[in-house]
Regions:
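Long, structured stretches of catalytic cores involved in phosphate-ester chemistry, encompassing
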Residues: 1-207
């Protein structure tokens, strides 16, 4: 599958080779063939008049993860109070062009609008949110403003049957998605279903 952490984004030649290997060994349509070291992953599919399925690319166009720890780049957990960049509105997980593409793609005449993407979209803190919370900077919590823009667009357009399909976090989640996760009275604008891994271990479940 498409997992950005399997590639090394700092080295263009390795990334190009990774895209080519992915293309050669996965059952993909011709339209997704890599060109000039780039691979167009995001696309939309219509299932008659019942559903529109939009597939996102949350790896190629993103800003770097916020607040990297010394000696360790990439994915980390960071405290919200210690990392103002988590809420920086200029940062994007999708990139400006893909954000616009998605905003224009909701099908108001379909019963269902399914958004398939790679990781948990719901807010998920490892510590008490009343104390600010601790978040994984590689997922949507690391790009909170982009998530808010996406969900605000769903709310403003009253997108029917909005469902987000996710994975990556090695656990099953079912979540209500809101524009403002800090407001317990905020309306639900979409539902999320996150599938678990087949064999990889997830986070501890003890309470």
């Amino acid at each position: 599958g498409w997992q950005g952490q399997r590639l090394e984004p700092d080295f263009a030649a390795l990334r190009t080779a990774g895209y080519q290997a992915w293309w050669e060994h996965m059952p993909l349509p011709k339209a997704m063939r890599p060109v000039a070291g780039r691979a167009r992953i995001h696309q939309r599919l219509d299932w008659g008049r019942l559903a529109r399925i939009q597939l996102l690319d949350a790896r190629q166009y993103r800003d770097p993860q916020a607040c990297p720890k010394p000696g360790r780049g990439g994915s980390n957990t960071v405290r919200r109070h210690d990392c103002p960049a988590l809420a920086d509105p200029a940062r994007s997980m999708l990139g400006a062009e893909q954000e616009r593409w998605l905003a224009e793609g909701w099908a108001l005449d379909r019963t269902w609008n399914l958004l398939a993407q790679t990781t948990l979209m719901a807010r998920c803190s490892l510590t008490d949110t009343a104390q600010g919370g601790t978040y994984w900077n590689d997922g949507w919590d690391g790009y909170a403003a982009n998530r808010q823009r996406l969900l605000a667009g769903v709310a403003e357009r009253r997108v029917p049957g909005a469902v987000v399909l996710s994975g990556d976090v090695h656990a099953n989640y079912v979540a209500d998605l809101k524009v403002d996760f800090d407001d317990p009275r905020a309306p639900v604008v979409a539902s999320e279903f996150c599938g678990t891994s087949i064999s990889s271990q997830g986070a501890p479940q003890a309470r």
